[in-house]
Amino acid sequence: MADNSSDEYEEDNKEKKKPSQLTPQQGFSENDDDDDDDSSETDSDDDDDDEEHGAPLEGAYDPADYEHLPVSAEIKELFEYISRYTPQLIDLDHKLKPFIPDFIPAVGDIDAFLKVPRPDGKPDHLGLLVLDEPSTKQSDPTVLSLWLTENSKQHNITQHMKVKSLEDAEKNPKAIDTWIESISELHRSKPPATVHYTRPMPDIDTLMQEWSPEFEELLGKVSLPTVEIDCSLAEYIDMICAILDIPFYKSRIQSLHLLFSLYSEFKNSQHFKALAEGKKTFTPPSNSASQAGDAETLSFL
């Protein structure tokens, strides 16, 4: 009986040891499952990366297409540099620079059709047949067409132009003043006319250069010829052009154009305006009368 009891005790211990020995193996298997899950996730991520980066683009370089080319080893080595190259991704900084545009689109607000009805109840069709916009300063169609014609340089094109007319102009002086102001602005904005001379002519800047001291000293003694001189108009033009170094020919139209252009430049020059104002404020010396008398005696006859 003692032997049987001891045998039964040993069998019970063996049965208890078996599950205790199996438990760490089960724990190890659970860790293995976690590792397998992690590895599967990383593999899936790698596959996704391969799909994103490794997917060949349409028309991309494929080395297999150029392996059969009968070229030397040096050329083949050059082809390998194509696959070795990896482009750099450069992030460009975008800077917001607000600015005022030259032209602003004239897009009006959406009409909500919140109209005040007329007292008599008649429909005014405001917003349907008549524009319901603020009374801003509208452009005159005739003046606008003149501006477009001037800017496009299309003066010789025959086209039908609308001639503006006013009814009861005596009672509407404001419209006349507006028309005069707009036309004056159009003429002021016109560039100066360009004239191509058929004969050689000096530049305006060359003619505006200072005279030599000897010539200026001579002008202090001898006055310029006036219109009272006894000569014809053609001779007087030749005389003035010769003094100002303007060449003149048989037809004096181009010489006169250059003469008046030179006069306009002197008149509009700020430098000579300041000199003229300075001479006005300057009081002449006492012997100016005697100098004037000498100048009269030495004038051209």
From Swiss-Prot:
Signal peptide: none
Sequence ranges of Acidic residues compositional bias: 1-12, 30-52
One GO CC term on file: cytoplasm
Sorted UniProt keywords: Cell projection, Cilium, Cytoplasm, Cytoskeleton, Phosphoprotein
Family annotation (Pfam families): IFT46_B_C
Sites bearing Phosphothreonine, chain numbering: 283
Residue ranges, annotated region (Disordered): 1-66
Protein's GO biological process: cilium assembly; intraciliary transport; smoothened signaling pathway
Localization annotation: Cytoplasm, Cytoskeleton, Cilium basal body; Cell projection, Cilium
InterPro entries, per database record: Intraflagellar_transp_cmplxB
Domain of life: Eukaryota
PANTHER family, per the entry: INTRAFLAGELLAR TRANSPORT PROTEIN 46 HOMOLOG
Record's subunit section: Component of the IFT complex B, at least composed of IFT20, IFT22, IFT25, IFT27, IFT46, IFT52, TRAF3IP1/IFT54, IFT57, IFT74, IFT80, IFT81, and IFT88. Interacts with IFT57, IFT88 and DAW1. Interacts with ARL13B. Interacts with IFT56. Interacts with TTC25. Interacts with IFT70B.
Function: Forms part of a complex involved in intraflagellar transport (IFT), the bi-directional movement of particles required for the assembly, maintenance and functioning of primary cilia. May play a role in chondrocyte maturation and skeletogenesis.
The family this protein is said to belong to: Belongs to the IFT46 family.
UniProt-recorded name of the protein: Intraflagellar transport protein 46 homolog
Organism: Rattus norvegicus
Encoding gene, per UniProt annotation: Ift46
